[in-house]
Amino acid sequence: VQIGDSHTAGDLFTGAWRSEGQQRYGRGGRGVLPAGRPYRGYMTMGVTAGQTDGWTTNSLMGRQYSKDGPALGFTGFTQTARISGAKLTLAADNSNFTFDKFSLCGVTGPEMGAVRVILGSVTQEFSFSAPKIDAACFDVLSSNLESRVEVETLSDQPVSLTSWTTMRSSGGLIISNLG
């Protein structure tokens, strides 16, 4: 994981390291990213993130920061939806970034909602409802390399997602960039 400034966020150095390293050691996946598109101009090399209306962002800094907002995860961003049917998508730009393992992390708590994750032919539902505020990650596995994953909220209860990760279960190098 490289944590840095806007050059890191834009994947300028890490993208080149990832490309060279994965050619040499195997393509392990794109790695951890903020869920969705947390800000205007958000760049991702190798994958394209998308989202429908209905999501708001709490950020570690800048105009999107809210001290009263949901907890922030490892990526420094949390995407929250309070409507049923809000979607986030992540698609591999080419076969170098296909994946068979997807991990989704978010904030848990008494009033939190649930999501449906679709990875190829695999569909699973996960609830973020819990007795106390905490965090949880859920994994979805496919028997095939997939090029797209979709996350959809299932109710009007809030869902606050802190990160998602794509990997290949066959192993290889993963370099994540967070800035």
Specify the residue positions occupied by each region the protein language model found.
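N-terminal hydrophobic targeting/anchoring segments and the immediately downstream early-domain regions
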Residues: V1, S19-E20
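Second-shell loop/turn segments in exported
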Residues: Q2-T8
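Glycan-recognition surfaces in beta-rich domains, encompassing non-catalytic CBMs
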Residues: G4, Q22-G179
